[in-house]
A protein has these predicted regions:
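Intrinsic low-complexity, intrinsically disordered or marginally ordered coil/linker segments
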Residues: 1-192
Length: 192
């Protein structure tokens, strides 16, 4: 099963390999316009919901995988020499595929995963069915270093990159203040 997983990851079809989207759901998720095409889409969507609980691929992927797109194809899969374990990394759309981790566990995999989304300020560790989620919003680099497990922080360089960002912002703010003071001196608004 590990070899199959590694091959699917390399193809960028890991989730589809183990938690496949039914063919009937591979339809447009949205609006085709007026007329017969739209009516046919609506009828197929309704039939899909009745049969699968989802109207289309998008709803299924988000519901069953936890993300809208499949994962893999990063060329980052390493199979352990004993063939019983693999290590990989991948990007996913919007969120980690938590629902997929749960389903993979049901299929017999042991899943341990770490994730980080800097733009949305969250990180976490998923292991043995437990999602340790960390909301990083409003935290500075020191707080992040204290709050996150060391392994998670180091895997993504979270507190380190935040510290660099904070230092850059401090330099820019200091320069902006100095420029403002100099400008105010030139205008006679501040005495020397």
């Amino acid at each position: 099963m590990i070899k199959r997983a590694a091959e699917a990851l390399d193809r960028g079809e890991f989730l589809q390999e183990f938690i496949p989207v039914p063919e009937d759901l591979k339809i447009t998720a949205g609006f085709l316009g007026e007329g017969d095409a739209q009516k046919a889409l609506e009828a197929q969507t309704k039939a899909n919901v009745e049969k699968y609980g989802y109207g289309n691929w998008y709803d299924y992927s988000v519901g069953e995988w936890g993300t809208k797109w499949d994962v893999g194809d990063d060329g980052a899969t390493d199979v352990h020499p004993d063939g019983k374990m693999l290590h990989t990394y991948f990007d996913s759309a919007w969120s980690p595929p938590i629902q997929a981790y749960e389903k993979l566990t049901e299929l017999g995999f042991t899943v341990g995963a770490m994730y980080y989304e800097g733009g949305m300020s969250y990180a976490g560790v998923w292991e043995d069915g437990v999602d340790d989620y960390y909301d990083l919003g409003g935290m500075n680099s020191t707080q992040v270093a204290e709050e996150l497990p060391v392994e998670l922080d180091e895997a993504f360089g979270i507190s380190e990159s935040m510290a660099e960002y904070e230092a850059e912002n401090e330099e820019e703010l200091t320069e902006w203040i100095k420029d403002g003071v100099e400008q105010n001196k030139k205008l006679g608004l501040v005495s020397e």
